[in-house]
Amino acid sequence: KGLDLYTYTNVTGVRLDGEKRVQGVDTDKGFIPCGKVVNACGVWSPEIGRMAGLEIPVEPRKGVILVSAPSFKFCNQKVQEFGYMISKFSNHECKRDPELEKYEVSFVIEPTDANNVLIGSSRNFAGYDISTEMEIIHVIAKRAIRFYPILKDLNCIRTYAGLRPFLADHLPLITQVDEVPGYYIATGHEGDGISMAPTTGRLISELIAGE
C-alpha cells in the first residue's frame, strides 16, 4: 500500500486510550490515527517518550567535525585511530593526554568527492548545544596533524557539530513497550545509526508483525 510521508510536521502528543493502548499521534497539522507508533527520534526520543508517560534515558552527546579546503587526494578512504573506540566507550583505564580525555577526542579522517576531508572527532555532553568551541577545534586539529602532518598546510573552511543519542551501556534500545501496547522504541545507536539502520528496521518490523 505504500506510505504517506509528512515532512515539516511536528509531533505534539501521542494519544492513548484508558488501557494505555496507542490510538494515534497529534501533530501541528492534525491528528493521525494509528495503532502502532515507533519512536525512532534519536536524541529527541526522550521527549516523544514522555508523551506516552515513558522515561527513555537517552542523552545527546555532541561531536565536532572540521572540514578542510579542497586539496590533492592524499587520503582515499576513511581512517581512524584505535583511540576512537576508547573514546566511544569512555574507557578511562587507558590513560591518554588530559586534553584528549576532556573532550574524548580521537582521530578520524574521511575524504569527500570534492577532495575536502572531514576530520574528527570529539564526544562531550553539552545538552542540545551544537556550537563548535574553539578549544575542541584546536584539540582535534592537533591530534589530526600528529597522524597526517600534511594537514598543517591545509585551511579549515568550516566546522559543525552533531548530536549522538547516547545510552550508558552503549547498546541501542530496540523494543516494544509492554506497558503501552502499540508503542515501539528504536534509539540509542549513538554514532552507529546509519550502519545499523537496516538491522534496526528489520527488528522493529518483526516486532510489529509479531514474528
Locations of the language-model features?
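General beta-strand structural signal in soluble alpha/beta enzymes
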Residues: 6-7, 39, 119, 185
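Active-site substrate-recognition segment that forms the wall
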Residues: 13-16, 21, 31-32, 41-159, ...
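A conserved beta-strand/loop element that lines the FAD pocket in flavoprotein oxidoreductases
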Residues: 2-11
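Alpha-helix N-cap/helix-start capping motif
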Residues: 9, 42-43, 198
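Core beta-strand elements of the Rossmann-like FAD/NAD(P) dinucleotide-binding domain
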Residues: 6, 26-36
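C-terminal lid/capping helical subdomain adjacent to the catalytic/cofactor pocket in oxidative enzymes
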Residues: 3, 18, 171-211
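Helix-loop-beta segment of a Rossmann-like dinucleotide-binding subdomain
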Residues: 1, 22-24, 122-126, 181, ...
